Regions:
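Non-catalytic, mostly N-terminal accessory regions of nucleic-acid modification and defense proteins
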Residues: 1-70, 139-143
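Conserved S-adenosyl-L-methionine
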Residues: 48-144
């Protein structure tokens, strides 16, 4: 992330952005992640990043057909913004939420289950941020 360019040059605007993020953080990671994905969708719709984004309803349908569990390893070899991985994480949290109360299961969920790779370094950063906003602390990511 050393090559990241910070484009908010106005100190007052930066302060407002940070305050807004802190307010969102108090509402939970799920809301922040949803907002992040919404903004990514707006970028894709305007052609800003040139990446293909699978529509949310298609992702949801595919994950529901897969029915992922805490015993699975979830891997997306062309992860982009990590939409598929995050939908799988959401499915697991909704269907095995009680099992996530166990510390070992929680650690596995946050650090071991989710794997992804992409050939675009910017998309890797976007996907990583998306995962972290959705409570996946140490995603297993590989730049290819």
């Amino acid at each position: 992330m050393e090559d990241t360019v910070f484009q908010i040059t106005n100190a007052r605007l930066l302060s407002r952005v940070v305050e807004g993020i802190e307010e969102l953080a108090s509402d939970g990671a799920d809301m922040m992640g949803d907002i992040y994905e919404y903004m990514l969708g707006k970028m894709a719709a305007s052609g800003t990043n040139g990446q293909f984004r699978t529509p949310r309803h298609i992702i949801r349908m595919m994950v529901e057909l897969m029915r992922p569990t805490l015993d699975d390893i979830i891997c997306d070899p062309a992860m982009g913004s990590a939409g598929f991985i995050m939908e799988a994480a959401k499915y697991i949290a909704e269907h095995q939420g009680d099992e996530l109360l166990n510390i070992d299961n929680r650690n596995r969920y946050r650090n071991e289950i989710f794997h992804g790779s992409d050939s675009d370094a910017s998309m890797m950063r976007i996907g990583c941020m998306n995962m972290m906003l959705h409570d996946v602390d140490e995603p297993q990511l590989h730049y290819r």
